């Protein structure tokens, strides 16, 4: 089976994207490119990057894009998210940074950005920017195993690829069983449900991307 490349945090940098594409051309067996959000950023080449993602060059790996936290904030600023007005972006950035972001993303791209999915399910893998709970949900090595299991269970997947933290990691949740007792007025029943081994994988950000082989479950950072 052909490998996947999982990228996030391009931040509007066309030069970085071109370098990643060039690297992937040299990687034997890499056939699928997933861009897990945060494509945009206050970079002069942001508009050109979005055009390239929407209209790949002939030799490019076809990018499969989902929206991330940055896209969510931009769409909120433009009224695509109802009453939400990018409160988180305003809390984390000053007004000049917000204005730069607005100026570097041409409004011609807004409908395309708004059409992107929250996440993708491929085989038994969930590909998402944050988590199944929220696009801004930041999972990393310190996240409670109970939270990780919840995020996996919501999607009903065995592997969850996440980008929000910007870190590269693989956390393994070992398999086991969930036991429950159900008691009524006549008897008590014991139910056992097997839980498979599951993983949460941080794909990194920018030039730090991840390669994954679904056939062997091998990950390369």
What are these regions (language model features)?
Residues 179-221:
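Binuclear metal-dependent phosphoesterase catalytic core
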Residues 27-28, 32, 102-174:
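His/acidic metal-ligating clusters that form di-metal
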Residues 1-5, 120-126, 195-199:
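Beta-strand-turn-beta hairpins that frame and shape the catalytic cleft
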Residues 82-94, 175-194:
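Charged, glycine/proline-rich intrinsically disordered loops and linkers
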Residues 11-16, 41-44, 70-75, 135, ...:
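Active-site environment of divalent metal-dependent phosphoester hydrolases
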Residues 7-8, 33-38, 64-69, 128, ...:
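Active-site neighborhood of phospho(di)ester-bond hydrolases with catalytic His/Asp-centered motifs
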Residues 1-52, 56-59:
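N-terminal active-site segment of His-dependent metallophosphoesterases
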Residues 42-43, 49-122, 145-150:
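Active-site neighborhood of divalent metal-dependent phosphoester bond hydrolases
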């Amino acid at each position: 089976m052909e490998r996947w490349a999982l990228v996030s945090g391009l931040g509007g940098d066309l030069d970085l994207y071109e370098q990643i594409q060039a690297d992937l051309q040299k990687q034997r067996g890499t056939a699928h490119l997933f861009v897990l959000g945060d494509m945009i950023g206050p970079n002069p080449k942001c508009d050109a990057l979005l055009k390239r993602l929407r209209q790949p060059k002939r030799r490019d790996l076809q990018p499969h894009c989902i929206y991330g936290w940055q896209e969510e904030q931009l769409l909120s600023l433009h009224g695509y998210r109802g009453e939400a007005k990018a409160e988180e972006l305003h809390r984390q950035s000053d007004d000049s940074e917000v204005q730069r972001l607005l100026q570097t993303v041409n409004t011609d791209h807004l409908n395309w950005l708004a059409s992107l999915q929250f996440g993708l399910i491929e085989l038994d893998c969930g590909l998402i920017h944050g988590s199944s709970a929220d696009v801004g949900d930041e999972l990393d090595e310190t996240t409670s195993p109970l939270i990780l299991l919840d995020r996996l269970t919501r999607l009903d997947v065995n592997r969850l690829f996440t980008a929000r933290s910007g870190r590269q990691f693989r956390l393994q949740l070992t398999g086991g069983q969930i036991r429950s007792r159900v008691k009524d007025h006549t008897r008590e029943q014991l139910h056992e449900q097997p839980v498979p081994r599951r993983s949460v994988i941080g794909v990194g950000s920018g030039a730090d991307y991840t390669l994954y082989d679904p056939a062997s479950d091998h990950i390369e950072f």
